[in-house]
Amino acid sequence: MIGFRTLFYKESLRFWKVATQTVAAPVVTAMLYLVIFGHVLDGRVEMLEGVAYTSFLIPGLVMMSVLQNAFANSSSSLIQSKISGNLVFILLAPLSHAEILAAYVGAAVLRGIAVGAGVFAITAWFAHLTFVAPVWIVVFAVLGAAILGTMGVIAGIWAEKFDQLAAFQNFLIMPATFLAGVFYSVQKLPPFWLAVSHFNPFFYMIDGFRYGFFGQSDVSPWTSLAIVSVFFAVLTAMAINLLKRGYKLRH
């Protein structure tokens, strides 16, 4: 447990020492999205009944920031350690594979939630928000951050250089996030794309998170929770298996 706490502290301190880049910058980016999309579309479209577009958009931006930054934290840390050669010291430490994964994912969750809280604190002034089911907000925020933190560990193990990690993020994480209903309700999509959206696990994270604010969602929050939980369990098993095998870590 001491080893886990030490690694978790190291990973948390790593992003907090450069909080201007790792926390403040994503908040500014989310603000730009809100100003552009909220200003142009507010009053012109309605995604949920009785909910202004800007109000609808804010939970999506918060969750998008949580997910993307949780992934960035664990993936960048691992690839940086691999390239610099200091990952060997973590692998040689008396830590179980589960403890290593938990420390990286825990720090990723911390950064994701910190960024999400920052985005919410700034954007909440621009619209009226309700909190119909705050428990769902917390559950999906933490679970979503943990999933992306685990995906970041997998990506960091797989990638051998920053270019490969960037490809993973640009061709998988960002499209999956943007196409998950951040800016729109999937019910507004044509039937084909509506069906495709239901195969995107990111959609269930964002939809369940938004339900906590408005009590309305495209899918039952219980269904979303079940799908997201299974997805997390599968990713966790994959990550631990890769760590046990030492895949691209021991050479």
Description of each model-found segment:
Residues 1-135, 139-251:
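Hydrophobic transmembrane alpha-helices and immediately adjacent juxtamembrane helices
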